[in-house]
Amino acid sequence: MGKTFLKESFSPSPFQRINKMNGLVFDIKEFAVHDGEGIRTTVFLKGCPLCCAWCHNPEGLSSKKELYLKQNGCLGCGLCRVPCDHDECKDLGRCLHVCPKNLVSVAGVEWESEELAEKLLTHKDFFNTMGGGITLSGGEPLLQAEFCVELLTLLKCQVHTAIETSGYAKQEDFIKVIRLCDFVYMDIKLADSEQHKKYTGMDNKIILENAEYLKHSGIPHTFRTPLIPNITDTQENLTAIEKLVGESSWEKLPYNSLAGAKYASVGRRYRLI
């Protein structure tokens, strides 16, 4: 498991600019080995336009900061349910400090693009020596397209960059972000539009249009399909996706059966149960 960075543990950037682009990040993990070539640092951007029934990062779905209550070890005392007057707690409706086991935190930290780039580039020599890099993930990073553009521009030519995306974004945003990436991982979950809407909340028209662009873009890429039992792993769906990806690289990812454990922590229900 990768090491999670907290913003508080890092000194602010010495660079000062008039216009700063902020992004909302719910996790940063180093020593990630499943998010691209080599050993990487993965930045998980908060917010997603889809709501996949099997999502393994429910804390990344909302575009806003939210409480994260760790379930393992909870005493059920109810103290955290009482609103408080701390400035940092008012908008969340619960107290961050009252839990006797310190299980309450906030999912979502704002980062300024230059500050985050400086943080990530502290490992530049290691990445360039070992063949790793930086991966933007989510949530859906393209939901914060302008922040991605600014961050990737700061990283460009200094370290290998990749993105993991559902492809659900305006093509204008999709193009301007992936053109700054050295590698693109894009999901194609379900080929049938109605099935896609049933299990993700949206149809796949935009996704397929962006996939077609990616196929002919010349940008190194791999399509991915999570194998969800009796939903995406059917022979009919996989055959249809195989036709869609054509000659492109295509990975089938195993189902993460532990995904449901995090849902209660952000007050959501796991739909696959």
Predicted regions and their residues:
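N-terminal cysteine/histidine-rich coordination modules
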Residues: 22-47, 53, 58
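Glycine/small-residue-rich loop that forms an oxyanion/phosphate-binding "nest" at active or ligand-binding sites
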Residues: 72-82, 93-130, 134-135
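Short glycine/proline- and charge-enriched loop/turn segments
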Residues: 264-272
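Iron-sulfur (Fe-S) cluster-binding segments and ferredoxin-like electron-carrier domains
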Residues: 57-67, 105-108
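Conserved AdoMet/S-adenosylmethionine-binding subsite of the radical SAM
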Residues: 114-117, 121-265
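Cysteine-centered iron-sulfur cluster-binding motifs in ferredoxin-type domains/subunits
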Residues: 42-55, 68-102, 140
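Targeting/processing segments of secretory and organellar proteins
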Residues: 2-9
